[in-house]
C-alpha cells in the first residue's frame, strides 16, 4: 500500500520526478494510461501523476492479485470529480478529483487539526486519492471474482479500501486514514441525497474511523469520544464498542473471499518487505 501512497504525493510537487518501479514486479493484466485532458487547467495534474508514476506503482501494488481478466485503470478528464465504476468499464482516476483534493488540502508548510490529530498537506493529499483508487479497484474485483455483496456495493468497497489501508505499516495507515477523514469531513455540508447509492460522506467518515480504530486502538485513540458527549468529529463510544465485532467480520470476509483464493502469497510477502517510501 505504501507504494501507492508515496506515489500519490504527486499532487504536491508538480516538477518532481520519482523513480520508475521495476517492470518485473508489475501485474501484467493491469493496463494503465494517462489520457490527455481536454481542459488546459487539468494538464498539470496529469503531469504530476505521470512524474510520480502513480499508475505504474498501482500495477506493482496489485501484482499479488491473480486476476482472471484484464483490469484497465486510467487517469482522465471526467467532467465531474468522480465517475462511479460500472461492470466492464475502466477504473478511472479523474483529474478533477485530484484537483479538488489539491484545493482542499492545507497549504505547503501548514499544519491543521482534525480532532486531536495534526494533519499535514502530504497526508491530506495521499489519503483521499489512495482511498478512491482502492475503492474503485475493489468494485472491479467484486465483479471479476463474482463476489457476493450483501448490502451496498459502495459501502463494501469503502470497507475493502479501509481494511487495505490499515493493514500495512502504521505510518501508511495514519497518512491514508487521517487524510481521507479530513477530505470526507470537509464535505459534510453536502445535502443528503437519499437516492444516492453511496452513503453520505458523514457516514463514510465514521465507517472509516470505525475500521481504523478497531485495527489499531492506540494509534487512532485520538478520534474516540473524549468527554461525556462526542464532538462532531469524534467516534462515539457506543459506535466504537461495535467496531471490533464489525472489523472481525470484515477481516474474515476479506480473507475468505479475496486473500486466500486470489492472492499469490510469495508475491505478497515480497511486496510487504519493500520499503515503499524510500525505494520508490
Each language-model region and where it sits:
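Bacterial N-terminal signal peptides
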Residues: 2-12
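Cleavable N-terminal signal peptides
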Residues: 5, 15-16, 161
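A metal-dependent hydrolase signature that marks the N-terminal structural subdomain at the beginning
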Residues: 17-107, 114-115, 249-252, 256-280
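Pan-zinc metallopeptidase signature
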Residues: 20-23, 194-280
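Soluble non-cytosolic domains of exported or imported proteins
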Residues: 45-53, 119-132, 148-155
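Short alpha-helix carrying the canonical HExxH Zn2+-binding catalytic motif
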Residues: 109, 125-142
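An active-site-proximal "capping" alpha-helix that borders the catalytic cofactor pocket
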Residues: 150-169
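Active-site/pore-lining binding-face segments in mid-to-C-terminal subdomains
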Residues: 166-216
